[in-house]
């Protein structure tokens, strides 16, 4: 809606190589509302095996387009092509796995000491999920959030890192090719309050899944408190490299 764009740089030479849309607050709001509309539609009502078909189709698209996706992620991040290409094939298995899990979600029957009363639990989709992805592993860390969310019948707004967003916009085109209902998966990128804060304070966002640093995580926790959104945070790990 804002029609603003920005250039993303190739870290090999620090030269611009792609132009991507910059989401305004209105764009972010529009993406969340599209996800909410999709959640109120057919998507969560589909049989799990029907949702599984879309997840498997996403996996197939990843395998068929691994070279293209790997090349884009390499140019955008500087990671080795042999790594990004293999990773695109590898993460297809995430979508396959959660496709298989979609129809295996069970509730429980709880013992209760009152006659003629039965207590049961059931699992239902939570709603709109905001998935916030860091620059250094866009495709992989999207898979860890998107695949389980879709399998359970949720809709998703993916906030791509503004440092290396190009590959997720291409991935979104592949997802669209599967025929998944409009609004189920949305991809945005942008800066500061207009994108990140608007997304994490939005009253229609029920869950926030974030991978990144502790400073941003603290802001997300504060923002999520406004609507009591559920939050899951992955804030890095100890991965020493001996040279």
Segments from the language model and where they lie:
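Short alpha-helical
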Residues: 26, 64, 68, 79, ...
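Hydrophobic packing residues within well-ordered alpha-helices of enzyme cores
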Residues: 95, 168-171, 199, 220
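Active-site-adjacent beta-strand anchor residues
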Residues: 21, 132, 157-161, 188-189, ...
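Glycine-rich loop-to-alpha-helix module at the N-terminal edge of alpha/beta enzyme cores
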Residues: 15-105
């Amino acid at each position: 809606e804002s029609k603003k764009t920005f250039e993303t740089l190739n870290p090999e030479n620090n030269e611009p190589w792609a132009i991507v849309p910059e989401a305004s607050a209105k764009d972010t709001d529009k993406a969340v509302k599209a996800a909410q509309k999709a959640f109120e539609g057919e998507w969560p009502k589909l049989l799990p095996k029907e949702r599984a078909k879309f997840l498997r189709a996403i996996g197939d698209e990843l395998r068929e387009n691994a070279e293209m996706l790997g090349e884009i992620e390499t140019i955008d991040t500087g990671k080795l092509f042999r790594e990004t290409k293999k990773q695109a094939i590898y993460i297809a298995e995430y979508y396959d796995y959660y496709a298989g899990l979609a129809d295996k979600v069970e509730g429980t029957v709880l013992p209760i000491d009152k006659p003629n009363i039965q207590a049961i639990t059931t699992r239902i989709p939570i709603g709109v999920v905001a998935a916030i992805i860091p620059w250094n592993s866009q495709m992989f860390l999207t898979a860890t959030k998107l695949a389980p969310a879709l399998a359970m019948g949720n809709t998703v707004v993916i906030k791509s890192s503004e440092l290396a967003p190009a590959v997720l916009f291409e991935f979104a085109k592949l997802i669209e090719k599967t025929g998944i209902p409009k609004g189920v998966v949305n991809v945005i990128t942008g800066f500061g309050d207009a994108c990140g804060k608007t997304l994490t304070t939005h009253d229609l966002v029920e869950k926030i899944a974030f991978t990144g640093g502790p400073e941003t995580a603290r802001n997300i926790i504060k923002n999520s408190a406004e609507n009591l959104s559920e939050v899951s945070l992955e804030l890095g790990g100890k991965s020493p490299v001996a040279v």
